[in-house]
């Protein structure tokens, strides 16, 4: 069963619409669905709410520590409520998936994502669930003829808002993620994965 759902992003109005904040977008939607408001909770270093979703009590969290220190916030909630790593779902932006794609997985490396890297370090475990929201990679914007030797600026890319057509398909992928939340929260993660991965 999933007891804690974390959305990753950076705090501050200047980052709200950026690709790196896709995890926040999903958790914001969940809070709206639950009719609750995330509030600044100092002891958890983030915006936090206890919500009732699909008949279960779930903790929602958006770390306000900046991305590369997200683990500090996640571990604070996990320790306080005695939540195990495999009862945690982290929603985050994923460079290795195209916009419009969304995938669910348990464990694995960080794929260069500093938020995941810090969460893994703080939990001393990779065995937490990830909901990977595709944002595409800046190399995909470089014409193939010019790709050899080109160094895409990943840091700049994730801190910029998606183009309109990308935003539309990212929003649609988040809706698909929300559609499988009943299974995810109840612990039917294999079923959720099959349903989610039937779509691109």
Curated annotation (Swiss-Prot):
Annotated site residue numbers, Discriminates between blocked and unblocked aminoacyl-tRNA: 10
A Pfam family that the UniProt record links to this protein: Pept_tRNA_hydro
Active site as annotated: 20 (proton acceptor)
Disulfide bridges in this chain: none
PROSITE patterns according to UniProt: PEPT_TRNA_HYDROL_1, PEPT_TRNA_HYDROL_2
Keyword check for Hydrolase: yes
Entry EC no(s): 3.1.1.29
Protein's GO biological process: protein quality control for misfolded or incompletely synthesized proteins; rescue of stalled ribosome
GO CC, any one term: cytoplasm
Xref: InterPro entries: Pept_tRNA_hydro (IPR001328), Pept_tRNA_hydro_CS (IPR018171), Pept_tRNA_hydro_sf (IPR036416)
Catalytic activity: an N-acyl-L-alpha-aminoacyl-tRNA + H2O = an N-acyl-L-amino acid + a tRNA + H(+)
Keywords from the named record: Cytoplasm, Hydrolase, RNA-binding, tRNA-binding
Recorded GO MF terms: peptidyl-tRNA hydrolase activity; tRNA binding
Residue positions binding tRNA: 15, 66, 68, 114
Location(s), subcellular: Cytoplasm
Family recorded in the similarity comment: Belongs to the PTH family.
Self-association and partners: Monomer.
Function: Hydrolyzes ribosome-free peptidyl-tRNAs (with 1 or more amino acids incorporated), which drop off the ribosome during protein synthesis, or as a result of ribosome stalling. Catalyzes the release of premature peptidyl moieties from peptidyl-tRNA molecules trapped in stalled 50S ribosomal subunits, and thus maintains levels of free tRNAs and 50S ribosomes.
Name recorded for this polypeptide: Peptidyl-tRNA hydrolase
Source organism of the structure: Paraburkholderia phytofirmans (strain DSM 17436 / LMG 22146 / PsJN)
Gene from which this protein is expressed: pth
